[in-house]
A protein has these predicted regions:
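Periplasmic-binding protein-like
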Residues: 41, 117-125, 201-238, 259-272
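Extracytoplasmic small-molecule ligand-binding "clamshell" domains
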Residues: 23-99
Length: 272
């Protein structure tokens, strides 16, 4: 009798514990009715603010599309580049729609979707800095946004150039980089092509120009969430797939970046 009662008790505990064990981030988001997206808002045309201070851009629309697919309301959480992963880990956001490069080092901490966008890179410099190519950055003070793919690559190249007249400085935001560049604190930076041409056309930075291509690999960027949230990662993968095959990816590209064909997200010889 005692064993029968014990078995029944264990069975009840198992039954009542299963829903809790199976609950995950995807369930939590749907239950809460809100999707909190980390978005970088000083990175046009991916993310910025309009004249009325409303968040706008490719990443903002992507977050809104994801929330719509989930049947919840989107909440844009402005997040500087260095804070994207900390915002996830601390629970301030549910996902990052923040142009995050899918590096193996970051994958130790967060989970990545398949790529939802891909970037090439250009130099941005001041018109009077004497820089007209990536190679001509050698011997100049340069800078980039801390924690980004281009910052890691640019700092590495400055170290390899070993020119005592040169140097690298990290900044907390893209806006800080362009302010320092326009004021003469640095002479150049490397940024995504989308940002480079948007900045050169910005009347607030009339003394800046595009200074040629940066010889970096294509930067594939992904949506991010906590690495253990397999259900959420699977959903994000299917969401990106749907964005492409329904034509929404191309539509957003032409709205914010184009006109033309958006970057190919297929990686030769890989499974996506």
């Amino acid at each position: 009798m005692k064993w029968t009662k014990l078995a029944a008790a264990v069975g009840l505990l198992t039954v009542f514990s299963v829903p809790q064990a199976m609950a995950d981030k995807l369930d939590d988001i749907i239950a809460s009715g809100v999707l909190r997206c980390a978005v970088v808002l000083d990175f046009p045309p991916m993310g910025s603010r309009d004249a009325d201070n409303n968040p706008v851009g490719f990443d903002v629309d992507t977050c809104n599309d994801l929330a719509k697919a989930l049947g919840v309301t989107a909440e844009i959480v402005e997040t500087p580049f260095p804070e994207r992963i900390p915002a996830l880990i601390s629970g301030r956001v549910d996902v990052g729609v923040a142009s995050t490069s899918d590096t193996l080092e970051r994958a130790k901490t967060v989970g990545f979707s398949i790529p939802y966008f891909a970037f090439t890179f250009n130099v941005v410099t001041r018109k009077d800095a004497g820089v007209d190519s990536y190679e001509s950055l050698k011997g100049h003070k340069v800078g980039s946004t801390s924690g980004t793919y281009e910052a890691i690559r640019l700092e590495k190249d400055v170290t390899n150039w070993a020119d005592p007249a040169g140097g690298f400085q990290a900044f907390q935001s893209q806006a800080d980089v362009f302010l320092a560049l326009s004021q003469g604190q640095i002479d150049g930076t490397a940024v995504t092509s989308t940002v480079a041409y948007a900045t050169a056309a910005d009347p607030n930075f009339s003394n800046l120009m595009v200074g040629g291509a940066a010889p970096y690999d294509i930067d594939y960027v992904s949506l991010i969430t906590l690495r253990q949230e397999y259900g959420m990662i699977n959903y994000l993968n299917l969401f990106v797939n749907q964005q492409v095959r329904t034509g929404r990816y191309k539509e957003l590209f032409n709205k914010w970046i184009g006109p033309g064909e958006p970057p190919n997200l297929l990686i030769p010889g890989a499974y996506y």
